[in-house]
C-alpha cells in the first residue's frame, strides 16, 4: 500500500519530507508527497488528480497547521487528530473512521475562507474538551478520501489563536510566520506516527 503524505504548501511538504526521512523507518514503505495548496477547491482538485493516476490502494496522511479558539485549554503546537470534520457553512458534521490513532482526537471545523473569529452556529456543537480547531481543508480531504474509500488520517498542528497571532498589525491582513510553521512540524514524532500506520497497514 502506498502512503500519501499531503500538506498545504511546498514549505510544509519540504519540512515534513526532511523529518520523515530522518525517522529512518526500516520497513519497505512506499511514500509519496503531495502539495495540495491552501483552500478547499485546490485540495479537492489536487487529491483527485493524484488518486486518478493509481490503481493500487493508498493510505492518505494529511498533516497541516490549523487555527484554534480555546486559548485557555490548548497547549500550543501539540498536534491533534481530527475525529470529526464540521462544515461551518452547512453545519453538517462527518465522523472520520478511526483507521489508526496517532494523536489526541478532536473536532475540526472547516471553512471556505480564512476565519477571523469563532463562527456563530445555529446548531449546538459539543467539542471534545471544549477545544475548537479551524482550517479550510480537512472537510474536503475527508470528502475525497471517503468517495474513493481510502483509509486516511487528518493530523492538525495548532499554530495560531484565531486571527490574533498571525495577523499583520499594519495592513490587517492574515500572514503566516513560516519559521513558526517549520518549528511546529520539526517537533512531530514522525517515527511513532509511521510505526502506527505501518501496524495498521500490516493488520489488513
Regions picked out by a protein language model, each given a short descriptive name:
Residues 24-204:
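Glycine-rich phosphate- or other oxyanion-binding loops that anchor nucleotides, phosphorylated ligands
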Residues 8-10, 138:
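Helix N-cap/beta->alpha junction signal
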Residues 1-4:
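Extreme N-terminal starter segment of soluble prokaryotic enzymes
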Residues 11-16, 42:
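Short N-terminal binding/cap micro-motifs at the start of the first secondary-structure element
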Residues 15-25:
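Short, aromatic/basic amphipathic alpha-helical patches
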Amino acid at each position: 500500500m502506498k502512503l500519501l503524505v499531503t500538506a498545504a504548501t511546498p514549505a510544509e511538504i519540504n519540512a515534513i519530507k526532511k523529518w520523515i526521512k530522518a525517522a529512518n523507518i526500516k520497513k519497505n514503505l512506499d511514500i509519496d508527497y503531495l502539495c495540495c495548496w491552501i483552500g478547499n477547491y485546490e485540495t479537492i482538485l489536487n487529491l483527485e488528480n493524484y488518486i486518478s493516476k493509481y490503481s493500487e490502494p493508498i493510505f492518505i496522511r494529511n498533516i497541516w497547521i490549523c487555527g484554534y479558539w480555546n486559548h485557555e485549554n490548548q497547549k500550543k503546537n501539540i498536534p491533534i487528530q481530527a475525529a470529526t470534520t464540521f462544515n461551518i457553512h452547512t453545519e453538517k458534521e462527518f465522523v472520520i473512521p478511526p483507521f489508526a490513532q496517532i494523536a489526541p482526537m478532536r473536532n475540526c471545523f472547516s471553512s471556505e475562507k480564512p476565519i477571523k473569529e469563532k463562527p456563530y452556529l445555529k446548531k449546538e456543537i459539543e467539542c471534545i474538551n471544549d477545544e475548537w480547531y479551524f482550517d479550510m481543508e480537512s472537510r474536503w480531504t475527508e470528502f475525497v478520501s471517503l468517495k474513493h474509500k481510502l483509509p486516511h488520517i487528518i493530523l492538525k498542528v495548532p499554530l495560531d489563536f484565531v486571527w490574533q497571532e498571525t495577523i499583520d498589525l499594519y495592513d490587517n491582513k492574515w500572514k503566516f510566520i513560516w519559521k513558526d510553521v517549520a518549528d511546529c512540524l520539526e517537533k512531530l514524532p514522525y517515527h511513532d506516527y509511521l510505526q502506527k500506520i505501518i501496524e495498521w497497514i500490516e493488520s489488513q
